Every structure is written in structure tokens, then in C-alpha cells.
Amino acid sequence: MNVVAIIMASQETCSGRAPRETPEWRRPACLVASILVRALEFSWLFSTCLLVAFDFARDCGLPPHSGKTWSDGKGPAALSFGKTNTKEATTNFYNRLDEKSGEEQAEKRKENSRSWIIYLL
């Protein structure tokens, strides 16, 4: 957090001044500070968008083409959110698929689930 405070303080001292009013030795520091502030803003925006996307995915259930909704917290979409033990949840979910639709369909759904998870990452 100290780094962020230093960057923000540098940015505040640099903003509002005309380039000729800024001392020559401060110009590179101001440029670096402004670049870092923009990077922090972008990373915050990007991480917020990811959180919203994962929350939406969890609520709606992914992948949509599997025909399953996972609002019970037992499917692969719930694994990233700490609702249950990852290994146990995955095993239980795919065991239910094996019982209902056979191993071939379960393997296809495993691949579809993996593709959605990789797509989201």
C-alpha cells in the first residue's frame, strides 16, 4: 500500500502544473507517476469486470449448453467461489452425469466445462 500512496502523492504534486512550472528534475518522475496511476486504474477496472463476470456465471450457471444449473453450489461454476471442496464437488458432479447420461456424455461435458473455465480465465 505504501507504493500506491507514494504514486498517488507524486501524481497530486504533478497535476495542475504547466510543464514549464514543473522543475526539470521532476518531469520524469511525474511521467512515471502518471503512467503508474493509469495502470492501477486499468487493473482495478479489469479486476472489477472479472469479478462481475464470475458472479454472473455463478448465478446463471455455466456452461449454458450443458443443460444444468448449478445454483446448488455443487457444479464446476461454484468451485472458484469456495462453496465446497473442489475435488469432492468435481467428483460428485461428474458421478451424477455418469449415472444419468453415460460416460461418453460425461466426457463431452467435462471438456465443455473446461473450455468455459479456460475462456473465463
Swiss-Prot record:
GO terms for molecular function: ATP binding. It comes from the Eukaryota. ATP binds at residues 77-84. Keywords: ATP-binding, Nucleotide-binding. This is Uncharacterized protein YGL034C.
